[in-house]
From Swiss-Prot:
NCBIfam families the record matches: PS_I_psaI
Pfam family name, one: PSI_8
Annotated GO biological process: photosynthesis
Name of the protein in its database record: Photosystem I reaction center subunit VIII
Transmembrane segment boundaries: 6-28
Highest rank taxon of the organism: Eukaryota
Keywords from the named record: Chloroplast, Membrane, Photosynthesis, Photosystem I, Plastid, Thylakoid, Transmembrane, Transmembrane helix
Coiled coil: none
One annotated Gene Ontology cellular component of this protein: photosystem I
Upper classification of the organism: Eukaryota, Viridiplantae, Streptophyta, Embryophyta, Tracheophyta
Membrane association type: Single-pass membrane protein
UniProt-annotated location(s): Plastid, Chloroplast thylakoid membrane
Keyword Membrane recorded: yes
Function recorded in the entry: May help in the organization of the PsaL subunit.
Length: 36
C-alpha cells in the first residue's frame, strides 16, 4: 500500500466511524437516563 492510497481509505473510514460512535454513545446515554 502506497502513501497515496492511504488517505482514500482513511477518510471514508473516519467519516463513517465518527458519526457511528457518536450515535451509539448518544443512544446509550439516552437509554441510561431514560429521557425518552
Amino acid at each position: 500500500m502506497t502513501d497515496l492510497n492511504l488517505p482514500s481509505i482513511f477518510v471514508p473510514l473516519v467519516g463513517l466511524l465518527f458519526p457511528a460512535i457518536a450515535m451509539v454513545s448518544l443512544f446509550f446515554h439516552v437509554q441510561k437516563n431514560k429521557i425518552v
